[in-house]
Amino acid sequence: MISTVQVPDFQQAMASFPGGITAVTTHSTDGPIGIIATAVCSLSAEPPSILVCVHKHASVHDAILDAGCFAVNLLSTRHQALVARFSQQRGAARFEPALWAPLKTGAPTLSDAALTLDCTLLDTHDGYSHTIIVGAVAATKVGDTANAGCLLWHDRTFARSSPLVAY
């Protein structure tokens, strides 16, 4: 059954759903390439795998399929300027070389990310306007978020993760 919910109503509902802001990156013949994304989640612990939903017209879409690898870099509140850079620049201009290095697959990873998942491309599935990209996690790197929580997108603005005081 096709949904009868109107697109603006769906978009408003999803704006209320907080999501971790990530930089999804890979390499291409023109250098590093990536996008900012919130449609990322774990798929399975055995085997360790994740999924990323990437618009079929996004600059990184075909590059991930061609490279066969990608990295998901969870951003912290320190990375608001990086999000702006990704929205204002294109291609390799989004990447300040001193901040990025490969882990295992060759995909660029952010040196001070809250978390990095370095993945090999495992499978893809059609998701209407998007491709659901499944990655096998080849390497992980956990950063420090003690002084800066994870960067979230909630109600169409930046938010931060922070622990709640137990009651």
Give each language-model segment a name.
Residues M1-Y167:
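Basic, polyanion-binding surface patches
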